[in-house]
Amino acid sequence: VDNATKRQLKKKDQFVALTTSGVHWAEEHRRKTIIAAVTLVVVVLAAVGGYTFYQHRTNEADTAFGAAMQVYQTPLLNPAQPMPPGTKTFNSAKERAAAANTQFTQVANQFGLTKSGKLAEYFAGVTYMEEGQNGPAEDAFKKTGASWDSGLAALGKSSLAELYQQTNRDAQAIDLYNELAKGTAATVPPMLAQLQLAELYQSQGKTEQARQIYAIIKDKDKDSKGKPGAASQIASEKLNPRAAAAPGLQ
């Protein structure tokens, strides 16, 4: 074979090699593109499916929580005020709390990741407390108090402080009221926490400390026109109970 022929054959081999390599690259690129596209579709479907599932769970939780609240709001039997025939009633608040607690606990356990599930945890604590089961109530309030939702966390801490007061742990209650008084939660406004703290001091006989807090609230809780707010009015009554008892003499 002469040199010219050899060169032609060599070029042909190079062309075949390049063509083969190009085909392989194209096929590999196409395969990767398809895999990437399929993966993207799977991710999108998973996201849509996950959202749909979450919405379904949320709706279930809302319905279950609503049913538990209906039980909790059931009227108590009052012989002096007969209820219409067929109206469900409970003989006592403790009996009602026990019935509602069963449902709140179930909602909290089954739908704990939803907003209604977290609210159910809080109301489980409330109903445990009404039943006199302080241990489980404390656990529920602590769990609620650790929530990422600041409004819900404030409710949990406020109820926990109340429980501490009822179980002679005033120092722990004071710590929580001071924390809430520095907060911004709409569910437990700072002024409310300050009022609760002042009332605790008053119950301990620490009248001067209570009066200092009432005086701060009285001066601070006013609108832009200087009109006293609800907390200011309560503080004024606490500072001057005689005037509050006989408003006509002012």
Q: What residue ranges belong to the model's regions?
A:
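N-terminal positive-inside, membrane-proximal cytosolic segments immediately preceding the first
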Residues: 1-38
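Short solvent-exposed coil/turn linkers within tandem alpha-helical repeat scaffolds
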Residues: 107-117, 131, 145-154, 181-190, ...
